[in-house]
Design a protein with these regions (language model features):
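Crotonase-fold acyl-CoA enzyme core
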Residues: 1-97
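Conserved N-box asparagine in the HATPase_c
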Residues: 143
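C-terminal long alpha-helix characteristic of the crotonase
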Residues: 13-18, 60, 69-119, 125-135, ...
Length: 173
């Protein structure tokens, strides 16, 4: 699998010795899979331009690409083990609705702090008092594990999605 397919993911971990490249300039083609959108946002324009222009191969721990990953691990086995642990933790301990809204707030963030504040406030107020919010607070107060059951439904969030999808239909969740 190419690294460009991982760029939109919420969490990326890698073995520090893994090799990756965006070889498009060496193949005479353009970037793909929204990498022109995600890459500069993840590692900065200067590093993204360097990587895309050279088309070279890098180790995951190279300073040019290491910021693509939230964590680098010393062996492939430890990488898989860690990734599964993180996935299990998310599945067992987080609200899917809250996680989706938080991800979308960061990925589709408005261009100014003021607009972002207004959108975050709207999302926050829509989540306050939901079944997942009530369960999250109650489980915290009772010092027990939360049992989140919420499902992301467009009708529950009339402002979602707030970004212009440019001809793409609303997601069916």
């Amino acid at each position: 699998m190419g690294v460009t397919l991982t760029l939109p993911t919420t969490i990326r971990v890698a073995w520090s010795g893994a090799k990756l490249a965006l070889p498009f300039s060496r193949r005479g083609v353009a970037l793909e899979s929204c990498s022109a959108f995600y890459l500069p946002r993840l590692i900065g324009l200067s590093k993204a331009m360097h990587i895309a222009t050279t088309g070279a191969t890098y180790r995951a721990d190279d300073p040019l690409v290491s910021d693509l990953f939230s964590k680098l691990l010393p062996t492939p086995e430890e990488t898989v083990k860690y990734a599964l642990e993180v996935a299990q933790d998310i599945a067992e301990n987080t609200s899917a609705v809250s996680t989706q809204i938080n991800r979308d707030l960061m990925v589709y963030c408005p261009p100014t702090p003021e607009e972002t504040h207004l959108l975050e406030s709207k999302a926050f107020l829509h989540l306050v008092g939901t079944e997942d919010n009530t369960e999250g607070v109650k489980s915290f107060m009772e010092k027990r594990k939360a049992e989140f059951k919420g499902v992301m439904k467009v009708e529950d969030f009339p402002f979602w999605p707030w970004w212009d999808s440019k001809g793409v239909s609303k997601p069916k969740l």
